[in-house]
Amino acid sequence: MRKETISYIFVGLALLASLCVSCNKKRKDGRTDTYSSGVISFASDESFSPIIEEEREIFEFTYQQAKVNPIYTNESDAISMLLNGKVCLAITSRDFKENERQNLRDRRFNPRSKAIAYDALALIINNENTDSCISVKDIKEILSGKATKWGDIYPGSKRGDIIVVFDNKKSSTVHFAEDSILGGKPITSPNVVATKKTADVITYVEKTPNAIGIIGSNWLNDKRDSTNLTFNKDIRVMSVSRIDEATPANSWKPYQYYMYNGNYPLTRTIWALLNDPLRGLPWGFSNFISSPKGQMIIFNAGLLPVQGNITIRDVKVTND
C-alpha cells in the first residue's frame, strides 16, 4: 500500500513538473493564444496579400476572439523571420529546404508545411503593346539578357528596350523566375526594375509602353467580376506557350481552368510553413485556409484550391 501511494505521488509530481515547464514556456514566449483565440503576427510574401487578406477577414469574422496580423514582406525575409523565431507562420511559394528543416529540428523544433493553394505568375504589358503571345523560351531569353529589345522577340517591333519589372529583388516571383524558368541561374537582363510591391509593378507597366511586369495572378482579377474571367482593364495579360514559337492557338492566359489542366506553364504552389510548438493560433489560421471554407475563398479569388473536387462544365453560348 505504501509503495502504491509513493508511486501515485511520484506520477503526480511528474505531471505537475511537466505542466509547470509548459506554463513557464508560455510565459517566456509571452504567448497566450489558443487554436482559435488571441493575437499573433505572421509573415507572408507580399505577392500573396490579396488572397491572404480575404482569408484573414473571414477567419477573424468567424473567430471573434482571434486577431492575426500579417507582415507583408519578401519571401526571403518571411522565411528568415520564421527560422529566427520572430513568427511561427510564413506564407511562401516554396516548402522548407532540407537544411532549414534540419536546422529547426536540431533546435528541438518540429517544423511542418502544407500546400494551401496554387496560383500562377502572370506577364503583364502596357495597353498600347499589341504583342499578346509569348513562349517560355522567349521569357528565358529576356531574363537571361539574350533578348534585350522587343524586336528580338517580335521582328519588326519598334518598342525599343524590354524593361522587366518585378515587385522585389528577394520576392517569390524572382525566386520562381530564377529557379523554374532559368534553371537555377540568376536574372542577368540589363534592363530590370525592382519596385517595392506588386501594386507598384502594375502602376509602372500602366505608364511604360515597353515594360513587361511579372506578378502573381491573384492581383489580376477585376473585383467587379464574380466569374473571375475579367482581368484588370488597365493592363494587358499575355498568353504564354510551352511551344518555342508562340501563337494564339498554343498560348494560354492564367485562368483557373488552364492552370488546372496544365496548359498554363507558369504555375506554382502556395505554402504555409509552420514552426509553432504550442500549436496555437498559427495552426488555427493555416488549418482554416485548408478547410472547405478557406479553400472556397481561394477558388472564388481565381486561384486553385488544393483540397476539394473541382467540377468542369462545358457551356454552350448561343446568339439569340
What is each residue range found by the language model?
Residues M1-V21:
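Sec-dependent bacterial lipoprotein signal peptides
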Residues M1-S7, K97, K149, S291:
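Serine/threonine-rich low-complexity intrinsically disordered regions
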Residues L16, E57-F59, Q102:
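Hydrophobic alpha-helical segments
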